[in-house]
Amino acid sequence: MIKFAERVGITLDDVDKLSIIHVSGTKGKGSTCAFCESILRHQGYKTGFFSSPHLVEVRERFRINGIPITREKFTNYFWDVFGKLEKTKESADGAMPAYFAFLTVMSLHIFLKEEVDVAIMEVGIGGQYDSTNLIRKPVVCGVSSLGLDHTSILGDTIDKIAWHKAGIFKPGTPAFTSPQPDNALDVMEERASEIGCPLSVTPPLSVYESNGPPLNLGIAGHKQRHNAALAVQLCKVWTDHRRGNRVRQKSSKEESCRTELSNMEASRLPPTVIEGLKHCRWDGRNQTIKKPGITYYLDGAHTLESVEQCIQWFKTVSSEESKQLSGRLVQVLVFNSTGDREANVLIEPLVNCGFDAAVFCPNIVLSTLNSVVARSTKTDVMNLTVTKESQLNRVLANMLLFERLAIKRLKQQIHETEMTQSDSSCSDAKRRKMDGDFIDKGDNSQSVCDIEDCVITKDFPCISSALTWATQGKEPNISSQSFIEIPSKLRNADHIQILVTGSLHLVGGVLGLIGPE
C-alpha cells in the first residue's frame, strides 16, 4: 500500500498531515463514521469521509461535507490516480493495486487535494491487514461492535476477529470501543498493551441524557445508540486535539479499560453534537421509503446480530405504520446473502417474522443489460468476482433453506396448537393435509405448500424482476416487464410492506431502481 501511495505522489508524511479518525468493527462501523462526520460538520469543520461499500455509485465512498463527490470530480481524481499508477507500472514489475486498495489511495489523494479538516476512514475488512492501515498517526481510533463476518479471512471466533480489528491501534493514539464480549475485550486489551495504545470502553448515551433531554438519532434502530456513543467519544477526542487540549492517555498499567470511562464525569453534549446526531443520514441502514401503496424497509444486515436488530426495528416501525393504514396489508421479504456467510443463521430468525411471501434474488440489478435503467446503474453495482451461475445457485439454495425452515416452523406451530386443544380433529386433518402438501417442487413454485398458513416463496434472476413481483407491478420507477403471475394471497393488497435485507449490495441495487425519495 505504501508503494502504491508513493507512486501516486503520496508519502507517509503526507498521510500524517491528514487529521484522521480511523474506525474498524463488524457491525456499525459505517454508521459510527457517519455520526462522526455529521457531528464534526455541524461544528463547522470541513469533513472527508471514506466508506465502503457503496450502494448505488462508487463515488458515494468519497464524501466531502457529507455529500458524495460529483461525477466530474470523481472522474478527474480517478484518472489522476490511475494515470500515475499506470505510468509507474513497468518500474514496479507491473504491480497495480486491487480494487479496494486503489480506492483507498484515491481517498487519500482526494482528502489531501480538498484540504479537509478531518478525514474519517472506515476500514474495509478486518483492520490489521486492511488497505487503510497504512495510516500511522491517526488522532483517534474506534472499534464498533464485533460479530462473526468474513470468517474465511478473519477467523471463525470473536477473539480471532478482535485481533484483526484491534490491528488499527497505534502507539500513543487513544482508542475507544463499543461494549464487546469479554473474550473479545481480552484480546483488544492485550493488543492495546502490546502496541502502547490507551484503550477505553465508551459509556452509553444515557450518561449524557441524565443531564438533558433524550437524544434523537438520525439513523433508526436501537443498536445505533452504541454507534452514536462511540462517535461522541471519537469526536470529543478529535476536537480536543484540534483545539490543542491535552488528551488524557491511560497507560497499559492503569485500570482496565472496562471501568475507566464508566467513572468519567458525565457532561451535557453541546448543541452542535446533538444536532449532528439528529440530522445524520446513512442510507441502507434501517431506512424507510414510503410510496403510494408501498413501504420499503431497507437494512443491509448480514450478520446474526444485525439481522436480529433489523427484525426488531422492522417489527416496530411496520407495526406503527399498520395502525395508520386501512384495507388489506401484506408483508414481503426480499433477501439475498453472499460470500462465506452462513445463510441459515440469517434466514432462521427471518422465517419467524411471519411474512406473507419471501422473494430471493442475486445482487444483479437487471438480467438484460440493454435496458435504459441498466445502462445507468449496472457498472457501479456489478460484481465481477463471481459468476452469474454461482449467484443464481446461491439464490436457489437460500430459497430452499427458507422453505425447509418455514415448514419446520409451521409443523411446530400446529403441534403446539394440538397440545392445547382438547378436540384436535381439525388440527389432525390440517396435519394430514400438510404432510401431503410438503413436497419438493423443483419448478420454482410460488408456495412452499398449498395450505393457507404457508409462506409464498419465489426466486428471480435479478432485483428488478423480484421487485416487480413483490410490488405487484406498482413500483413506478421500474419499467414494465413481461407479465409475472402474482398469487391470489398477495393480489390486490391495499398496501405492501417490503423488507429488503441480507446484503448491503442488494439494498444498493434496490435503491438504484426505486430512485431518489
Predicted regions and their residues:
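Extended acidic/charged loop-beta regions that coordinate divalent cations
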Residues: 53, 106-153, 185-222
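C-terminal helical cap/extension that packs against the catalytic core
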Residues: 181-191, 296, 304, 348-494
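N-terminal leader/targeting and accessory segments in enzymes
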Residues: 1-27, 31-46, 176
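ATP-dependent carboxylate-amine ligase catalytic core
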Residues: 6-18, 42-136, 152-154, 182
